Amino acid sequence: MNNAEVLNVALDEDSSNSNDDLNYSEYQPKNHPIKSHYDMDIENVHFLLEPTMSKKKCETEYLPGTTSFGMSVFNLSNAIVGSGILGLSYAMANTGIALFMILLVFVTVFSLYSIHLLLKTANEGGSLLYEQLGLKAFGIPGKLAASGSVTLQNIGAMSSYLYIVKYELPLVIKALMDIKESNGEWYLNGDYLVIMVSLAIILPLSLLRNLGYLGYTSGFSPLCMVFFLIVVIYKKFEIPCPLEAMNMTSNSSSHDHMAHNETDDEMCKPKYFVFNSQTVYAVPILTFSFVCHPAVLPIYQELKGRSRRRMMNVSNVSFFAMFIMYLLAALFGYLTFYSKVEPELLHTYSKVFGAGVIFVVVRLAVLMAVTLTVPIVIFPIRSSLNELFCSGKDFAWIRHILITFLILAFTNVLVIFVPTIRDIFGFIGASAAAMLVFILPSAFYIRLVKKESMKSVQKIGALLFLIGGIIVMIGSMTLIILDWIHNSTSGGN
């Protein structure tokens, strides 16, 4: 098979030709050295490519996949699940059970539809790299939009991880040292602790040029979340309602609008439809929780027996599993605390159990998972910045260290000064996540899939999806900013 045949991926979707699904098992790359600046920096191999595809890049992109269906499902599930699960109970408390389930179904279905568009665009556009699709569709602006959205989403994810460190590590230290009351000790200050963890653990790991086996620790994250889900379900039947401990904290500004006039009966009665100033955060939180699109194409590339249908089956199984997991976590967390649930569910339990052994174990597991995940998240951010601003330059340790330090410093500043994790979920979910889920896949599809006219059902559907994504992004961002302004003028958080 020659190179022209390899790159000829713009075929009809229903064609029986195996090339339609990027199945290039016949292509055998030659084993000889190829000079490229990507050889100098391992970070750049699977990220932003140059417009002119060299032979090595062709070989890298179209090698036959070797990952099994089950492992691909695990990898995609791992890419989906993250800190967003901790904010879902808060979203349910501010939408009601019925409205939350409706929104959850819609976000799940729309996310799967956008993956369908992305996979078809990858076939038609001849690339399995997200940023490269942006370059082919809209040139440099498209590449910048894709790279910027991925970078912003990763910064948001990293911020949420460090925010968990900021608020959970002091509780773990208090429990391990059996400290009942805090008197302002520096080692119980979350701001100091997140900086120390960043400098002592995250920075050295992030400076590695090749993360190697650290990448396998990312598989620890979904296991921690499953453990967390089991504990949430179990504790629902152990915690009484109403909660006196939670009643003592009902003057929290984030819950005043819901709880200040509630009786015990009202407080323990689930609500099915809720509309308040915090409802606007529901869609961004859900969108943030389902973003996995930058990882879809690399997983597709590695899938054994690669085909669009097989990858959609992987996506369907992964999203269904996450749908069930998210629904159970949100439902049982909400039915435990009702309107008193906080933006970060795990932190809410500290108001009831304090230093309970089981939650110390949960916190330690989650802290270990998020701490080891941050260097993995920094990896693609640094690669994108290197490619955007230092393309073609040889690797330099000074630049490598400086970029890593600036990324980590910027994220620490965000974590220290942003009032709640809700604001991170909301802003990133309404901006970068909306771009990755709604806007970019549909825009790439409309631009790169040439064989379908704009009057076709597929193109009209993609156009409506694009318009809907723009409305969601602008509407959510506007309402979130208005809520911030209202809180700042009223002395809230």
From Swiss-Prot:
Record-annotated disulphide pairs: C241-C268
GO cellular component labels: plasma membrane
Regulation: Inhibited by N-methyl-D-glucamine. Inhibited by choline. Allosteric regulation of sodium ions binding by pH.
Membrane topology, as annotated: Multi-pass membrane protein
Compartments reported by the entry: Cell membrane
Keyword Transport: yes
Catalysed reaction, written as an equation: L-alanine(in) + Na(+)(in) = L-alanine(out) + Na(+)(out); glycine(in) + Na(+)(in) = glycine(out) + Na(+)(out); L-serine(in) + Na(+)(in) = L-serine(out) + Na(+)(out); L-proline(in) + Na(+)(in) = L-proline(out) + Na(+)(out)
GO biological process, one term: L-proline import across plasma membrane
Spans through the membrane: 73-92, 99-119, 155-173, 185-205, 214-234, 280-300, 317-337, 359-379, 401-421, 424-444, 460-482
Record's keyword terms, sorted: Amino-acid transport, Cell membrane, Disulfide bond, Glycoprotein, Ion transport, Membrane, Sodium, Sodium transport, Symport, Transmembrane, Transmembrane helix, Transport
A GO molecular-function annotation: alanine:sodium symporter activity
UniProt keyword Plastid, yes or no: no
Residue intervals on the Cytoplasmic side: 1-72, 120-154, 206-213, 301-316, 380-400, 445-459
Binding annotation for Na(+): N78, T373
Glycosylation: residue positions: N247, N251, N261
Entry note about domains: The extracellular C-terminal domain controls the voltage dependence for amino acid transports activity.
Family that this chain belongs to: Belongs to the amino acid/polyamine transporter 2 family.
Full protein name: Sodium-coupled neutral amino acid symporter 2
Naturally occurring in which organism (per UniProt): Xenopus tropicalis
Gene: slc38a2
